[in-house]
Amino acid sequence: MKYFVVALALVAAFACIAESKPAESEHELAEVEEENELADLEDAVWLEHLADLSDLEEARGFFGNTWKKIKGKADKIMLKKAVKIMVKKEGIFKEEAQAKVDAMSKKQIRLYLLKYYGKKALQKASEKL
C-alpha cells in the first residue's frame, strides 16, 4: 500500500513536469519588460533567469518520455491489481474479472482502485481507534 501511494505521488510529480508550459522566448520577455516597466534589479534578475530556462527544454523532453514509460507501467499494474481485487472481492473467475476490467476506461479503473484502497484505509483507521 505504501509503495502504491509513493508510486502515485511520483506519477503526479512527473505529470506536473511533463505538462508544464515551455519557457518564454527573449522577445516575449522583452515585451513583458516593456509592459511592466521593470526597473527593479530583482525583476531584471528574474527575467534573466527566465531567459536561461530555454536550456531546460531538453530536460523537459527527457522527463516527458520517462513520464510516458512510467505511466504505461503504472497503467499495467493498475489493470492487474483491479483484476486481483475483483477476483477476491466478487468471487469470480480471473477471465471474467479481466473482461470486466477491459470494458472499463482508465478513469473508471483508477476510481475503482481508489475506492477500494480508501475503504481499506478507513477500516484500518477505525480499528486503531
Curated annotation (Swiss-Prot):
Pfam families tied to this protein: Latarcin
Protein name: M-zodatoxin-Lt8i
Subcellular location: Secreted
Keyword Signal set for record: yes
GO biological process, one term: defense response to bacterium
Gene Ontology CC, one term: extracellular region
Prodomain residues: 21-60
Keywords attached to this entry: Antibiotic, Antimicrobial, Cytolysis, Hemolysis, Secreted, Signal, Toxin
Signal sequence region: 1-20
One annotated GO molecular function: toxin activity
Presence of the UniProt keyword NAD in the record: no
Tissue expression per record: Expressed by the venom gland.
Organism, as annotated: Lachesana tarabaevi (Spider)
Function: Insecticidal, cytolytic and antimicrobial peptide. Forms voltage-dependent, ion-permeable channels in membranes. At high concentration causes cell membrane lysis.
Family to which the UniProt record says this protein belongs: Belongs to the cationic peptide 06 (cytoinsectotoxin) family.
Ranges annotated as spanning the membrane: none
Top-rank lineage group of the source organism: Eukaryota
Gene designation: cit 1-6
InterPro entries xref list: Latarcin_precursor
